């Protein structure tokens, strides 16, 4: 379970998140919804320990602080909205993120990955593409499929459907729900999409 109590985040002496309290149970998907600039992504970054905040953040009853954050961060999968692609090929991207030493994915692992791609409406031919040829939506869905393979204790997802149509948005929401349920994992997602938010167990409107 992810528990956040009285979270407050300031930037340049301005409070951007004030007294946020929420819980995300194992197997549950909670959506943070709000206008651009209201602090949704900052909440995810606070959970990761990347920015300063006041309040309490706990993962499975372990309080995040200066002593524990590095270890707890290893238990979190994070799919950002935008990220640098320092990889030439999709295959290289997958192996780098999953930290695999072999030259290719094991057959069982690749089968699982391809199943995830099908569920995310990703063309299987993308596996052999150059990374620069991918759209933003394709890159993010590939990262989401990898996050599912990592089997972490918590999944954080930032705007996973920002470049997608309504039908694909529903498929992504269903995939995230499946991950949460099958891996008994809490998921905290950021989205401005009502279509995505309506598929979640709970919606937290961030003012």
Q: Locations of the language-model features?
A:
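Conserved ABC ATPase signature
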Residues: 130-134, 138
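Catalytic Walker B motif of ABC-type/P-loop ATPase nucleotide-binding domains
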Residues: 155-159
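Q-loop/switch helix immediately C-terminal to the Walker
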Residues: 82, 88-104
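Helix-to-loop junction immediately C-terminal to a conserved catalytic motif
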Residues: 47-48
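The feature captures the beta-strand-to-loop junction immediately N-terminal to the Walker
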Residues: 33-35
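Conserved ABC transporter NBD signature motif
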Residues: 52-65, 72
């Amino acid at each position: 379970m992810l528990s956040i109590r009285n979270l407050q985040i300031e930037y340049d002496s301005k409070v951007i998140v004030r007294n946020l309290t929420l819980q995300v149970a194992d197997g549950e998907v909670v959506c943070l919804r709000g206008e651009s600039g209201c602090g949704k992504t900052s909440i995810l970054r606070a959970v990761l320990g990347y920015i300063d905040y006041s309040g309490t953040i706990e993962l499975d009853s372990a309080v995040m602080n200066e002593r524990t954050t590095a270890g707890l961060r290893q238990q979190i999968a994070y799919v950002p909205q935008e990220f640098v692609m320092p990889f030439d090929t999709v295959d290289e991207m997958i192996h780098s993120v999953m930290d695999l030493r072999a030259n290719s994915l094991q057959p069982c692992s690749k089968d699982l990955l391809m199943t995830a791609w099908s569920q995310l409406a990703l063309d299987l031919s993308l596996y052999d593409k150059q990374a620069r040829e991918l759209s933003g939506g394709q890159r993010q869905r590939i990262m989401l499929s990898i996050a599912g393979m990592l089997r972490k204790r918590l999944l954080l997802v930032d705007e996973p459907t920002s470049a997608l149509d309504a039908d694909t948005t529903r498929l992504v929401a269903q995939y995230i729900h499946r991950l949460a349920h099958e891996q008994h994992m809490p998921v905290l997602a950021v989205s401005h999409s009502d279509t995505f938010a309506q598929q979640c167990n709970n919606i937290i409107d961030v003012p």
